[in-house]
Amino acid sequence: MNLKFLTKLKISIPIPVFGTGCGVLGLSLSKVSLNLGKYASTLLKALEYRGYDSTGGVFQTKNMEVTLLKDVGAPSTLVKTLGIEEQAGKIFCGQVRWATFGTVTKKNAQPHIVKCKNFIYGAHNGNITNTRELKKFLLSEGHNVVSDNDGEMLVHTVEHYFDNELSKIASNEHFIPEKRRACMRQAIINASKKMVGSYAAVIVDPHTEMVYAIKAGSSLYFGIGEIDSNNFGLASSDLTAVLRFTKMLVNLREGEFVEYDQNNFNVYAFKDLKIKRPNQPDLIIKQGSKIEKKPVRSKLRAEDTELIPPFEYFMEQEIQAEIETSGKLIKLFQGGSNTGRRMVELLKRENIHEEMKDIGENILKKDDFQKQSKIFNKFNDSEKAAEFYRKVREEYTSIYDVLVTEGFEKKYFFSTDKNTFIDLLESHFDKKKLLIAKALDSISELSDVKQFQESIRNFLEIIDNSIKNNRNIYTIACGTSFHASKVAALFFNEIANLEIIPCLPGDFRGQYSKSLKDNDVIIGVSQSGETKDLIDIFNDVEDSGLKIKMIVLANNMNSTLGQEKSDVSIPIFCGPEIAVPATKSFINQITLFYYLAIKIAELKLENLKKENGSQDLIRELSRKLDQRYKSIEDIPKLIEDTIATSREGIEYISSKIYMEPSLHILATKMIGVAKEGALKIRETVLNHAEGGEASEFKHGPNTILGKNTVFGFKNVRKMIRYFNEILEKAFDLA
């Protein structure tokens, strides 16, 4: 889809993206580098989508010499005009800002250097909601607060408690590294109790050259690696920024912080933590405890987060990718890809399945690429691998012919570990290596299928229990995920004759939180798995003591919701999304909900059979279920055809109405799609747009119509007739 007409717009108003606004960075190198400014520029520009009303960075060289560069403006501009690109140094602390507390001024830009009681500096992303109270407190304690920015309040608050802790030890011990680090850790714990809000922060003590990255309700990622013969530790609000420098990641949970320099890191809890574990007692971690963690190689590749020609916009690229991502999710429904199943059958026939399975497991256990490559290449060089390749080439030509097609690894690798195996191919094209990598991927894919099917079984058990106890099922989500939940309510009602109640977190808290009962079910939907409002609801439900099961549908399974808060977590498998407007995740969410509705209908049918229900009814329900299972296979092709056939029409209509001041998208039943369409308009061109139930339009919204309102196509009667025909077809499918 060509979006070039949007370049005519000359709008400088930032798009507010609540929950993702602002981004923070902390990079520590093993030695002073002349390239630190270049690294910093790359990182800041990678975070530009999170905020661009101001940009800043602190660069520390040696002997505690620091340079602060910040101003109003976007990273893509300021990295040059501020001279960020030319900076040398050993430590970089940076931030891009979408303004919340404090107007858009240089003073309110981050990072902040403070020296009231002790010399530290830092920045944050998120919101400290008690900023005014903190400012009064800090001023009363003698701090020199120069802005209204909540990031400055955070840095001063840490400084305040850091000074308190240092005052408890002898003055001649203040600069003993171990003592000083212990004081800073306790300061972070104490400061976190004083501050209210959701944030991620980076704090630097220039004396010890230690960096502290704190995850308190906002996304934060940490990785270690080497660049230009320089070891480093890197914290960022954005995963893709870290992946540009390293694939070795350390998973941080909400409530944890990491203390690190270029060579070492340690993770601590700044509050008491209770971690859910499947089929095990909850893991209890006490405040201040050190948490043992090892770096793990990311399953994502940097290429997965890059704009690939001919696309000019991430949103355009991700819309096109819906064909592939929905197809890969559907393959999970079907028990795996055809190529994967055929490969595993071949491995079993040739009696090397177990050996290949062991090789794959050993590769995935290693956190170092060189060690992984050594295992892979050892088997590749073996006589057994040569014999396997010969047999495939001579006796399994259908597999071999597919193997040598262009872009095979992009089209036919499906497992969550696929990028690990693709990386092992390195840059040169080797058919034997490709065959081995595909074999490993196929084994891993079937493992994914088993895990997915187990999650679905657990989901159905929970839903079945809720139905038998006549209890409520709530879906709770924000933004695009909420709109997908509205579509889910339609699917569950039409297909499974089951009511679910879709809620925004605020509505749930106000309308349902006090009336929950045992055997109710909460289904949280989140692309990131880090949606703070949703995490708060899950925490409240858990604290209630009621016997309520909590389910999560998430894209990022290594997340707070995916790993720590849910009884069952189900992946949506849409891959990374870079564009702020969610596209792939919405399609995969509603595809997954459609499948879950079918599975619940199937469950009800099985119960009806056990109860010796009407045979005519059973046959009719079975026929409908078969139709729906077949309709799932058509989804990727339907998306592909829709993109192809509507391209010109969308471009034409968009070019005509993108400057209209107000748009209304009306729906009958499919209100979730209408609301999502309106959100996409607001996110991309900043128009006012609303999506709503068509019958409600006359009850208020029509009062704002005027002579400049766009009502629709010229031939309204013809449009309505076609629209009704489309609706009839849609409802036959639904």
Regions found by a protein language model. Give the residues of each.
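Acidic catalytic cores of enzymes that act on phosphate-bearing nucleotides/polynucleotides
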Residues: 654-726
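Internal, active-site/partner-interface "lid" segment
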Residues: 154, 169-173, 182-186, 601-648, ...
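Glycine-rich phosphate-binding loops that contact phosphosugars or nucleotide phosphates
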Residues: 361, 374, 380-381, 387-418, ...
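Structural motif
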Residues: 91, 120, 472-474, 521, ...
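Short, solvent-exposed amphipathic alpha-helical segments in soluble enzyme
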Residues: 42-45, 111, 218-220, 227-229, ...
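Conserved short alpha-helical segments that host acidic/polar catalytic motifs at enzyme active sites
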Residues: 5-471, 642-646
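A structural-propensity feature for long, helix-poor, extended segments
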Residues: 162-166, 175-178, 247-248, 255, ...
